[in-house]
């Protein structure tokens, strides 16, 4: 209820007040640099919170990852980026609070609460003998920067307390994570990069850097409820100015045309599986991206028609305004009787039968 009210207020207070975007931030990509390269060692088959001292959540405290190593070792990694809204100014960050954890200090207890959801969904259930993920190392990247995991900026939004800063450091945090994760899993052969909502956007926008960091592994992408469409009106300018997002340098058009990222990834990484899960008229994305009524439906249809024509780019799309499909991983069934679980498993295993569902 609180999130729904915040989203309603977001629409009412901001739809007509988009400032003109400032200068374009420079794109950036490549292998991560800086930070520790020490491997992470934690007990197998249990979740451990691993803070990284050089990283920052929104309030300036350390960010980190949750790690659940496979028993007996593995050359497979499931890397999941968490979602939880976004914020880009004083109203969204501190009044409406439309992004999770930007004022929180992340802890082991919070990690356990969040990863329990993944197990309940079925993604990290090691007891499911049908799961292609059951013997993989699990890595969970919490979301505490409000920037779709791709920001590289520190902002002072509180004019009454100018010393209060918000760290939109999702991209630089990911740099640090990748350095140590590569050292922890140097022999990885398969990496599944997944995310829901804000995490789905982070997964898509970070795919190039993850693939470069794990250059010896096959990296495949699954973005849930994260249609890579352009926000409406001036909203993308507001977000871009706040976050200074880290965009792949190979995608020269991405700063002004986000769907072009999929074209770039499909060309740069041929044969990699690029999957999308979506509700075609997602109401949550409609509000965050400032679309008029029905606008997300048209934007989604355009994305599917123009970007998901590449070899190995596929979608599982349901009609409606709901948000997040992976919560129904074990129960959702799409057109033609195709279950979401079977579709995701086909994506994960490279099944030639993997195809569009709508």
What are these regions (language model features)?
Residues 13-15:
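C-terminal motif of bacterial Sec signal peptides marking the signal peptidase cleavage site
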């Amino acid at each position: 209820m609180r999130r729904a009210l915040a989203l309603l207020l977001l629409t009412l207070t901001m739809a007509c007040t988009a400032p003109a975007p400032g200068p374009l931030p420079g794109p950036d990509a490549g292998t991560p640099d800086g930070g520790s390269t020490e491997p992470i060692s934690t007990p197998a088959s249990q979740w451990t919170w691993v803070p990284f001292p050089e990283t920052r959540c929104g309030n300036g405290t350390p960010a980190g990852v949750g790690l659940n190593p496979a028993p007996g070792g593995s050359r497979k990694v499931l890397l999941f980026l968490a979602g939880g809204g976004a914020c880009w100014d004083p109203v969204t960050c501190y009044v409406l609070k439309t992004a999770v954890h930007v004022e929180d200090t992340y802890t082991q207890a919070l990690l356990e609460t969040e990863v329990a959801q993944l197990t309940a969904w079925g993604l990290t259930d090691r007891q499911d003998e049908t799961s292609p993920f059951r013997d993989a190392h699990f890595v969970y990247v919490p979301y505490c920067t409000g920037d779709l995991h791709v920001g590289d900026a520190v902002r002072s939004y509180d004019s009454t307390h100018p010393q209060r800063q918000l760290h939109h450091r999702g991209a630089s945090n990911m740099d640090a994570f990748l350095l140590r994760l590569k050292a922890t899993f140097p022999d990885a052969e398969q990496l599944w990069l997944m995310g829901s909502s804000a995490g789905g956007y982070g997964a898509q926008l970070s795919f190039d850097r993850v693939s470069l960091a794990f250059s010896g592994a096959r990296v495949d992408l699954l973005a849930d409820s994260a249609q890579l469409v352009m926000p409406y009106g001036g909203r993308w300018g507001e977000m871009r100015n706040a976050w200074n997002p880290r965009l792949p340098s190979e995608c020269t058009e991405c700063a002004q045309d986000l769907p072009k990222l999929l074209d770039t990834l499909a060309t740069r990484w041929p044969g990699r599986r690029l999957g999308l899960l979506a509700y075609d008229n997602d109401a949550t994305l409609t509000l965050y991206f400032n679309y008029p009524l029905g606008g997300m439906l048209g934007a989604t249809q355009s994305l599917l028609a123009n970007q998901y024509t590449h070899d190995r780019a596929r979608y599982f799309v349901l009609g409606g305004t709901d948000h997040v499909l992976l919560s129904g991983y074990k129960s959702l069934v799409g057109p033609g009787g195709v279950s979401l679980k079977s579709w995701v498993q086909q994506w994960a295993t490279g099944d030639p039968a993997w195809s569009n569902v709508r």
